Amino acid sequence: LDRGGKGEYTGSEDCLYLNVFTPKKISSDKKLPVMFWIHGGGNTSGEAASYDFSKLASAHELVIVSINYRLGFLGWFYHPAFAATSNNLEDKSGNFGTLDQIMALKWVKQNINDFGGDKNNVTVFGESAGGHNVFALLSSPLAKGLFHKAISQSGATNTFDLEEASKFFDNKESSLLTSSKEVI
């Protein structure tokens, strides 16, 4: 999602794409390490296409995957109505952007060998909000076994269980907070 000119959001949920960068020459007998890039942008803006990893992939003999995922309210929106209408915990969470990232990691595990990558040597890395998302993946049981190393560049994280999130949602003053210390 990108912010439009007058405070409006433009975009689409049709954003679940990824890019795979490989060295120009790949040896069929050697599986390469995989780097899984999560862009920054406050989880409200940004896209995988902003980054060209082709030179990095060739220079260091890596397979690099950059992903798109739902952003803004399409990516992270908890509402009590989700709990009432959803049959599974994942949908109840409202963490759709994180679930998109996990889906992309599952795709990597199933398909990266076809691109010369080693599905047993995957490093997730991201900067800013992407770094925050790295921490979210580290703490998610749904991502267990989908990657092996992690690099967070300037990201931080906080987590809330569903009960805490619903209390935070119901607190009308929560929108007035200016510091993460105020949440604690």
Where are these regions (language model features)?
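Serine-hydrolase-like catalytic core of hydrolytic proteins
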Residues: 5-183
